[in-house]
Amino acid sequence: MTTAPVVSPSLSRLHSAPASPFPKAPVGSGAGVAFPARPYGPSLRLRSAVMAASGVGGNGSPMAPEESAVSSRLGEVKRVTKETNVHVKINLDGTGVANSSTGIPFLDHMLDQLASHGLFDVYVKATGDTHIDDHHSNEDIALAIGTALLQALGDRKGINRFGHFTAPLDEAAVEVILDLSGRPHLSCGLSIPTERVGTYDTQLVEHFFQSLVNTSGMTLHIRQLAGNNSHHIIEATFKAFARALRQATEYDLRRRGTIPSSKGVLSRS
């Protein structure tokens, strides 16, 4: 004689699937589950406000432009002379997208470093009298980038203003210190051992930064700490510059809305 198993009422309740409080979506319909709305309390509002002000999302990643209350800072310059035709666009709040075609391959490579390590979106298109040499194109591109940077910074409210970074590249190491002060000054302490990297005249490195400083109105110090490979020294310089510029242009949460100067203004002198 077989006896039917006895199931405890409490055990039955334990193993039975509870009714879901959420409506079921039809299989294959692609409809999502409707979750009940949660109250948006003061603590959650405060946390969201802090994240928005600091440009950080809920997972700690940088916020996309649509998530942040701060609009992207953009600059665009077209410079046309009898020697060159230059078009530059820069987004200080970008993602590191580079689109450069300058007619100078090594300079394109360096502008890629500026975008990638600064997390700036950088667009540079240029044609010029490179059949003579790269001097005019190199200079006018830097002048246009500096002017676009000046536009993008606007009144400079809330930014860190200062940047400092040391970048190594194998045996080379270069330190960059900068101040978005409105006062153009360059001190360049590079010792590049060869006259050229590829077809690029290495004298043009200092001239590039001098031209950029002149139109952007920044104070820039470049100091070579080590290095004997010309390519490495120059690339470490651009990487350190990009990182320092990123620091200087990013927002200081405690200073949001105010100009980072004791005199209350940052302008070209």
Curated annotation (Swiss-Prot):
<keyword id="KW-0809">Transit peptide</keyword>
<comment type="pathway">
    <text>Amino-acid biosynthesis; L-histidine biosynthesis; L-histidine from 5-phospho-alpha-D-ribose 1-diphosphate: step 6/9.</text>
</comment>
<keyword id="KW-0028">Amino-acid biosynthesis</keyword>
<dbReference type="InterPro" id="IPR020568">
    <property type="entry name" value="Ribosomal_Su5_D2-typ_SF"/>
</dbReference>
<feature type="binding site">
    <location>
        <begin position="261"/>
        <end position="263"/>
    </location>
    <ligand>
        <name>substrate</name>
    </ligand>
</feature>
<feature type="binding site">
    <location>
        <position position="83"/>
    </location>
    <ligand>
        <name>substrate</name>
    </ligand>
</feature>
<feature type="binding site">
    <location>
        <position position="161"/>
    </location>
    <ligand>
        <name>substrate</name>
    </ligand>
</feature>
<keyword id="KW-0456">Lyase</keyword>
<dbReference type="GO" id="GO:0000105">
    <property type="term" value="P:L-histidine biosynthetic process"/>
</dbReference>
<feature type="binding site">
    <location>
        <position position="139"/>
    </location>
    <ligand>
        <name>Mn(2+) 2</name>
    </ligand>
</feature>
<keyword id="KW-0150">Chloroplast</keyword>
<keyword id="KW-0464">Manganese</keyword>
<feature type="binding site">
    <location>
        <position position="235"/>
    </location>
    <ligand>
        <name>Mn(2+) 1</name>
    </ligand>
</feature>
<dbReference type="GO" id="GO:0046872">
    <property type="term" value="F:metal ion binding"/>
</dbReference>
<feature type="binding site">
    <location>
        <position position="183"/>
    </location>
    <ligand>
        <name>substrate</name>
    </ligand>
</feature>
<dbReference type="InterPro" id="IPR038494">
    <property type="entry name" value="IGPD_sf"/>
</dbReference>
<feature type="transit peptide" description="Chloroplast">
    <location>
        <begin position="1"/>
        <end position="51"/>
    </location>
</feature>
<feature type="binding site">
    <location>
        <position position="136"/>
    </location>
    <ligand>
        <name>Mn(2+) 1</name>
    </ligand>
</feature>
<feature type="binding site">
    <location>
        <begin position="135"/>
        <end position="139"/>
    </location>
    <ligand>
        <name>substrate</name>
    </ligand>
</feature>
<feature type="binding site">
    <location>
        <begin position="109"/>
        <end position="117"/>
    </location>
    <ligand>
        <name>substrate</name>
    </ligand>
</feature>
<feature type="binding site">
    <location>
        <position position="109"/>
    </location>
    <ligand>
        <name>Mn(2+) 1</name>
    </ligand>
</feature>
<comment type="similarity">
    <text>Belongs to the imidazoleglycerol-phosphate dehydratase family.</text>
</comment>
<dbReference type="InterPro" id="IPR020565">
    <property type="entry name" value="ImidazoleglycerP_deHydtase_CS"/>
</dbReference>
<dbReference type="Pfam" id="PF00475">
    <property type="entry name" value="IGPD"/>
</dbReference>
<keyword id="KW-0368">Histidine biosynthesis</keyword>
<keyword id="KW-0934">Plastid</keyword>
<keyword id="KW-0479">Metal-binding</keyword>
<protein>
    <recommendedName>
        <fullName>Imidazoleglycerol-phosphate dehydratase 3, chloroplastic</fullName>
        <ecNumber>4.2.1.19</ecNumber>
    </recommendedName>
</protein>
<dbReference type="GO" id="GO:0009507">
    <property type="term" value="C:chloroplast"/>
</dbReference>
<feature type="binding site">
    <location>
        <begin position="231"/>
        <end position="239"/>
    </location>
    <ligand>
        <name>substrate</name>
    </ligand>
</feature>
<feature type="binding site">
    <location>
        <position position="231"/>
    </location>
    <ligand>
        <name>Mn(2+) 1</name>
    </ligand>
</feature>
<dbReference type="GO" id="GO:0004424">
    <property type="term" value="F:imidazoleglycerol-phosphate dehydratase activity"/>
</dbReference>
<dbReference type="InterPro" id="IPR000807">
    <property type="entry name" value="ImidazoleglycerolP_deHydtase"/>
</dbReference>
<feature type="binding site">
    <location>
        <position position="232"/>
    </location>
    <ligand>
        <name>Mn(2+) 2</name>
    </ligand>
</feature>
<feature type="binding site">
    <location>
        <position position="207"/>
    </location>
    <ligand>
        <name>Mn(2+) 2</name>
    </ligand>
</feature>
<feature type="binding site">
    <location>
        <position position="135"/>
    </location>
    <ligand>
        <name>Mn(2+) 2</name>
    </ligand>
</feature>
